[in-house]
Amino acid sequence: MADGRASSAQSGENLLFLTDEQLRQGIEAMFFAYRGFTADPDRILSDMAYGRAHHRAVHFINRAPGTTVNNLLNILGVTKQSLNRVLRTLIEDGLVESKVGKADKRERHLFLTEEGHALEQKLSDAQRVRMRMAYREAGPDAVAGFRRVLEAMMDREMRNAYGRLKDSGT
């Protein structure tokens, strides 16, 4: 029994205080995990001369069809100029459609086209495969703990935006 508790403590379970070395290892693990998480979509996007900004835009337009450019700016945390460059290419390539708002003609609402949905599906399928494998290997308790850690790392505004997106059920 004592051995089980020692190995649990070493793995980070039930620790209230982490050493700088344990924190550094967590930071490095996130860097490498992020590289793995983005590697598959990066390969798909590179064939189209797109980058991660295109991926994020397509992802969040898919999650909230009809979202406004301003809402997407808030979610992505990028400059208007940067987002406009990305949206221009996605619209020109027939992946995103921009419609003028009915209530406010100054607003532009964004929707994925059929081709945009196909790209989003391909990108998210690649990431779901990786996430599913990792979650299965880690187990349900680790999955719940991982999600809590990620949510705890978000600033309040980000956590609120994430909560709204999560609660939208799309």
Regions found by a protein language model. Name each.
Residues 1-48:
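N-terminal leader segment of winged-helix/HTH proteins
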Residues 34, 65, 76, 80, ...:
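Flexible interhelical turns and helix-capping residues at alpha-helix boundaries
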Residues 144-170:
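Exposed, interaction-prone assembly regions rather than primary DNA-binding/catalytic cores
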